[in-house]
């Protein structure tokens, strides 16, 4: 589940910065919720193609590759080749760790720009691109601050990060425009529990990005420093200091074939 961000220095976010590695790790865990369904819908586990040559494009922390490794039978992995590519060296650090810990067979990790891979055409039998964009809306915490402050909804935030990839009809249209056949698109919803401390940390990491996009400079000067504590109070008040925060994760799973 890739990212389309607004332009301009105040609204820009370097999602490949080291500070966001932990946030991507959470995104990777959420991605794993849906990876089995994506892989199953692709038909790869039952593919008769030999050898399998798989690209995990924009692999992030290696969530899809990890599920692939545990899903595909040893007979198919004996002569397959798996390439994990991402633009960020920081993200690939996590993928390399997973590759070594889980002893992936015939796998390589390399820098790849998802928008311009420069990889050979018609080389791969299967290509997966799965990206998770998790954002804390902060809306409830913002409304507890004084001042008439914009409290963006989840839909408004996703309108910044996820343009064109958050509606089934739009995703289908993109696949059709790219020349895919046998297109299947469906929405899947799952629940994910996150430790409160991790939830709060992820929210506070994103505060500068959210307020830079939706608040004026005067609003940031007056209230941004108060927002981290407001987040702590709201989340701990709702879930308890040592509790688990419940998140509802939603994914659009889309597959298609090219001949």
From Swiss-Prot:
Gene3D superfamilies registered for this protein in UniProt: Vaccinia Virus protein VP39
Disruption phenotype: Fails to produce aflavarin.
GO biological process: methylation
Annotated InterPro entries: Methyltransf_25, SAM-dependent_MTases_sf
GO MF annotation terms: methyltransferase activity
Name of the top EC class for this enzyme: transferase
Entry annotated with the keyword Aminoacyl-tRNA synthetase: no
Annotated Pfam families: Methyltransf_25
The protein's Enzyme Commission number: 2.1.1.-
Keywords carried by this UniProt record: Methyltransferase, S-adenosyl-L-methionine, Transferase
Swiss-Prot/TrEMBL induction comment: Expression is induced by the developmental and secondary metabolism regulator veA.
SUPFAM superfamilies: S-adenosyl-L-methionine-dependent methyltransferases
Pathway annotation from the record: Secondary metabolite biosynthesis
Function text: Methyltransferase; part of the gene cluster that mediates the biosynthesis of aflavarin, a bicoumarin that exhibits anti-insectan activity against the fungivorous beetle C.hemipterus.
Family: Belongs to the class I-like SAM-binding methyltransferase superfamily.
Protein name as annotated: Methyltransferase afvD
Organism: Aspergillus flavus (strain ATCC 200026 / FGSC A1120 / IAM 13836 / NRRL 3357 / JCM 12722 / SRRC 167)
